[in-house]
Amino acid sequence: MKLNNKFAIGCLIQWYEIEMIGEYLESLENAINFIKGEADIKIDMCFNINQDLEKVDTKLISMEEISEKFYSIVEEKLKDIPYTCWTNEDDIYTIADYRREFNEQYCDEVDVLMWGESDSLIPRQTFQILDNLHSSVKENTPKYVSFFSTCKMWDESWLPIEHTEFTDKPFIDGDTENWWSLRYNMNIDEMNAFNDKVEELDIRVINQYKFNGCGLVMSSDVVKSGVNIPKSLFFIHEDTAFMLQLQQLFGGKIPQYVIKNILLVHNRKHTKKRSYVKGELKTDDVSGGRLRHDWYKKASDMSHHNCYNMFNQSKIYTWKDVFNG
């Protein structure tokens, strides 16, 4: 099946994600190889080895060894698949920075943009579904966002994007054993078991936006029209800022297409998400590891403030405020 539209998928990989990145790359490989015809899909990755925020525990491994391991994994997983991969070392570089620049660069080159994420597994049907969706809606709604379904979330506001087989399950705080739970680490075979049995897509339209950044899809016309991540978002909350920009500029007139019965896995509490970080313990979960760094909560709070005060007269914080304030 030949794809009729052009795509770009971009992912920032932090050096400490080295032990889990192979899973994302394998899912990406599966999605590319699932296409049985011509396809124009630009794969973009940034490998961030800057240590201004987190430092490598050199008693365990060196940055050179991490870099060698990363590029070996990329070559193994993507094999003959074309990709662009570049390394950042000199400056602090966050998910907000990467996604902003990815949008700016590729919106002029492709029809559809997708945000990859190092702790995600994308469905192998991804690009066929998105190609058919874009071809179906581009004449009447050339500006849109889209989202595959996700696991059981913590409150009812997420119901519109929960997978149809997950949404009637209970949310159990801290649960790592049940397959529908937020903290459960799902593998590719488990994801495929849900997606491969789908015979007819359940695509729903919502205008009260609900998404996170993991796997967010947007038509390039959305970015060309001025929706992007503001530079005031220097750390996190970039997905929320993008959503607020979308609401502010278009007042809910741009649809969000939710592919309700196709699961995109977000292993947000992956047990290997933060490896070899100096000062963190193997027993730390993702949140616990981050909070061992004095700067983290301050940067998170300041980025949160910037996100929710974009449209009023309020101070914009930067990394300088985090370290010197």
What name fits each language-model region?
Residues 7-24, 31, 48-50, 149-150:
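A conserved hydrophobic helix/loop-capping motif in glycosyltransferases and polysaccharide synthases
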Residues 14-24, 86-87, 96-98, 126:
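Catalytic phosphate/metal-binding cores of nucleic-acid and nucleotide-processing enzymes, i.e., regions
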Residues 52-110:
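Active-site-proximal specificity loops/subdomain of glycosyltransferases
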Residues 109-121:
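Short beta-strand-to-loop acidic/aromatic patch adjacent to the donor-nucleotide binding site
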